[in-house]
From Swiss-Prot:
UniProt lineage: Bacteria, Pseudomonadati, Pseudomonadota, Alphaproteobacteria, Hyphomonadales
Name of protein: Cell division protein FtsQ
Bilayer-crossing regions: 30-52
HAMAP family: FtsQ_subfam
Organism, as annotated: Hirschia baltica (strain ATCC 49814 / DSM 5838 / IFAM 1418)
Single GO biological process annotation from the record: FtsZ-dependent cytokinesis
InterPro entries listed in its UniProt record: Cell_div_FtsQ/DivIB_C, FtsQ, FtsQ_C_sf, POTRA, POTRA_FtsQ_type
Domain (POTRA) ranges: 75-144
PANTHER family associated with the record: CELL DIVISION PROTEIN FTSQ
Topology in membrane: Single-pass type II membrane protein
Pfam family, one: FtsQ_DivIB_C
Keywords attached to this entry: Cell cycle, Cell division, Cell inner membrane, Cell membrane, Membrane, Transmembrane, Transmembrane helix
Amino acid sequence: MSQVRSKSQQGKRQAKPQEVVPATILTEQLSTYAFGTVTAGAVMVAVAAWMGGSLASIDERIQGGLDATAKSAGFTVTKISIEGLDPRTKADVLNAVAIPVDSNMFRADPFVIKERIEASVENVSEVRVLRQWPNDIWILAENRRPLALWQTDGEWKVVDQVGKPMDGEDPAEYVELPRVVGPAGGYAAPELLAQLKLHPQISEHLEVAMRVGGRRWDLRLDSGLEIALPEDAQVDEALLAVYNLDEATGVLAEDSEVTRIDARDLERFAVGLGEARAAYDQSSQIDDKSGGA
C-alpha cells in the first residue's frame, strides 16, 4: 500500500516549468552545431580523398570540403566593415586583411587578422576585430595621432595617444606638443596628459614633465613654477588640491612668489620661495638642453 500511495503522490506532482535559454547561449549552441556540421563534412571529404585520390591532394580536398560545407551552411564572409579610420588607412587595412568575399567565415580568425593589420599598417592603434555571425567582419581601430614629445637617452621622439613612439615622425614638426622626459615617460604620458586636461591652469602652461622613478611626475610650468606630484594613483587628488590652493592663494599666478609646490604628501604641501627654487634647479635632471626639441 505504501508503494501505491507513493506512486499516487508522484502523479500529483506538477511538472517543472521549462527554463528559458538566454539568446546568447542559443547563439553559441548554433555556432557549435554549425562548426560540427562543417567538421563532419570535412571528415567525409577526407575519407573520400583517401579512398579515391593521392595523398598529396588530401589536404587540398579537406580545405575545399570545409569551404564548400561552410558556404552551403551560409557561413561565408559577405561584408568587411572598418570603423574609426580615414579613407586611406581603411584601404591599407583592407589590403592587409587579405580575406576575399565569400571566404569561409571560420577561417576569418580575429587574432590572425589583428596581427596582420598591426604588422602591415603603421598608422593604426587600438585594433579590435570581431566576427558578426554568420557573414560580417567588423574592424575597429584608430588612426595614430601625435600626443607628446618624449626625450629618452638624449633623443626626442614623437609618441602617439597610447604612448608608443611613432617612428619616422620628425619631432621638429611637433614643437607645440607637450614634452615629457625620463625613462618610460612616453608610455606614461597619455594618462598624465588626460588628467591635466581637467586642469587647464596647469596644462596650458606646462613646459615639461619629468618622469621620476617610473612611478610619479615633476612638472615645470612656463612661469618657472615646479610641482612635485605624488605616485600615479594619487595624481588626480593632488591636482585637485593644487587647484584649490590656487583658488585660495593664487599660487599659480604668473607674478606669484611661489617657485615650488611639493604635493607628494597630500596631508601637507610644502611651498618653496626664492632660493629654494635655485637649490631645486641645481638638483633637477631637467637642464636647458632638455627644454627644447
